[in-house]
Regions:
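Short beta->alpha connector loops
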Residues: 61-64, 122-124, 146-147
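NAD(P)+-binding Rossmann beta1-loop-alpha1 motif at the extreme N-terminus of oxidoreductases
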Residues: 1-42, 199
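Active-site-lining helix/loop region of Rossmann-like oxidoreductase modules
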Residues: 138-206
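Rossmann-like NAD(P)-binding element
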Residues: 34-35, 40, 46-81, 86-91
Length: 206
């Protein structure tokens, strides 16, 4: 599958390496692609990356994601599955940019013809692509209004090492708020543990 990843930071690079290892055709999208040729991964401009992609991944800072996607244009994104892994936070990481909503909802509202699925934002880049390295099974969440888009996303999560038994569909795109709002607790837990390589495991009573 042709996967375009918007962004060239740790998350975008980790996901690109993970999906490339699983046999997918990956391309990173940058506003300044000529300055990002040292990544060991193919890099192109944002519009070229969007045109390349069967699946587009938003791995840009949540504060700029919607404007960046608007620069590509709704016609170029129409009908393309967009997996959103971003979270909007203040510069000091103490406040959410969308406290009464979510980045995923903002993207879906701005691009109604683009199915959006939220996932992978409750963990760091290392954990996203190496769940088997954790001390036990954990949970990855999916939010979105389009059932087929979530099924495709689930298959791509499986390719990163997340079995179906670890994937939990928590509802429509409004449920992305729960995923994104975990970011503040994630920061607190990371400070307490002295490590960012952890994630959530949903457990139930027998």
């Amino acid at each position: 599958m042709r996967i375009g990843l918007l962004g060239t930071g740790n998350v975008a690079r980790a996901l690109a390496h993970g999906w490339s290892a699983a046999g997918h055709d990956v391309l990173l999208g940058s506003r300044k692609p000529d300055e990002r040729k040292d990544l060991g991964l193919p890099v192109a401009g944002l519009n070229e990356t969007a045109a390349h992609a069967e699946v587009l991944v938003n791995a840009t800072p949540g504060n700029v994601s919607v404007d960046l996607l608007r620069s590509i244009g709704a016609p170029a994104l129409a009908g393309t599955l967009l997996i959103d892994v971003g979270v909007g936070l203040s510069d000091d990481f103490t406040e959410l940019s969308h406290p009464n909503s979510s980045l995923a909802e903002q993207i879906q509202t701005a691009f109604p013809d683009t199915p959006v699925v939220k996932t992978l934002c409750t963990m760091d880049a290392t954990t996203m692509v190496a769940p088997a390295a954790l001390t036990g099974p954990s949970t990855v969440f999916l939010s979105g209004d389009d059932a087929e888009a979530k099924r495709t996303t689930g298959r791509l999560l499986t390719d990163l090492g997340w079995p179906e038994s670890s994937q939990l569909d928590i509802g429509g795109i409004t449920s992305a708020r729960g995923q994104e709002h975990f970011a503040l607790l994630f920061i607190g837990i990371a400070n307490g543990l002295g490590s960012h390589t952890f994630t959530i495991k949903v457990v139930t009573l027998p």
